[in-house]
């Protein structure tokens, strides 16, 4: 029995879990210095670090971890008209959460990089199948049978997917489209599943909205506007989600929980 976890969420400030001291790192262990002031960047700090080769990763302490292990990932969304009244659309929902575990050298998507065709389809149409195919192309860096696809979820609401992983695949990438929207989505990219040589037991990551950079639409129901030049994936700031042009809005949280 792993003990009692008390998960805390303070919107737009900090998210994390109080974990028994003998097991499981906290959110602060997962993230790196410099993210504390911007909760929207939690879960992405690792992507800014130089990647190790697969050979270097094989020598890392993670290989001493017990495996396989099982996790549940819950997408809890609370995007609503009361908190985000500007142009709020009918039928607010999120597409099926899609993604899976992988090794350090693999990227399903990454902030600051151009969206792949698979991410474009997920962000614009909520279609997880191209993403599944892109994931499978990762070879030994992924676990093809563990690519998970959840259910469409109305907002507010929640959906949960499950996956298993091992000591060679200790990162997680998942996405879900905010809909209706031009090309907006939520998710994490290369979120570490370990810290300090231990599997993460439970953690909550704030979810803000990312713009895939593949459509120039500025509101939920905007007509398709193909950009002259695709833009890198970036946080969506200002309207219609936030009244502050410099602020991204939190619309949910991703809760990761180890189940065995």
PLM region descriptions:
Residues 1-4:
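Positively charged n-region of N-terminal signal peptides that target proteins for export
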Residues 12, 33-35, 203:
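Disulfide-bonded cysteine motifs in exported proteins
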Residues 14-16:
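C-terminal motif of bacterial Sec signal peptides marking the signal peptidase cleavage site
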Residues 18-20:
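Bacterial signal peptide processing site
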Residues 22-35:
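Ser/Thr-rich, Pro/Gly/Ala-heavy low-complexity intrinsically disordered linkers and tails
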Residues 43-47, 52-56, 60-70, 78-186:
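Structured domain cores in non-transmembrane regions
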Residues 137-260:
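Mature, soluble, non-transmembrane domains
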């Amino acid at each position: 029995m792993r003990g009692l976890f008390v998960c805390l969420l303070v919107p737009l400030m900090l998210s994390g879990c109080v974990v028994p001291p003998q097991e499981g790192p906290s959110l602060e262990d997962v993230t790196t210095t410099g993210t504390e002031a911007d909760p929207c960047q939690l879960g992405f700090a690792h992507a800014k670090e130089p990647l190790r080769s697969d050979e270097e990763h094989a020598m890392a302490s993670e290989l001493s971890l017990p495996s396989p292990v099982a996790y549940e990932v819950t997408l809890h969304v609370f995007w609503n008209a009361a908190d985000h009244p500007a142009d709020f659309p009918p039928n607010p929902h999120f597409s099926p959460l899609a993604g899976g575990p992988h090794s350090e050298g693999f990227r399903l998507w990454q902030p600051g990089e151009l969206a792949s065709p698979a991410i474009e389809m997920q962000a614009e149409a909520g279609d997880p199948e191209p993403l599944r195919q892109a994931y499978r192309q990762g070879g030994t860096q992924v676990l093809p049978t563990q690519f998970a696809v959840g259910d469409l979820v109305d907002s507010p609401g929640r959906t949960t997917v499950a996956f298993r992983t091992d000591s060679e695949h200790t990162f997680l990438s998942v996405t879900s489209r905010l809909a209706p929207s031009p090309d907006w989505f939520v998710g994490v990219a290369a979120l570490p599943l370990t810290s300090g040589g231990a599997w993460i037991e439970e953690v909550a990551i704030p979810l803000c909205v990312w713009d895939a950079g593949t459509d120039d639409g500025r509101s939920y129901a905007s007509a398709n506007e193909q950009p002259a030049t695709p833009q890198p994936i970036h946080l969506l700031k200002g309207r219609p989600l936030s009244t502050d042009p410099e602020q991204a809005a939190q619309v949910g949280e991703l809760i990761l929980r180890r189940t065995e």
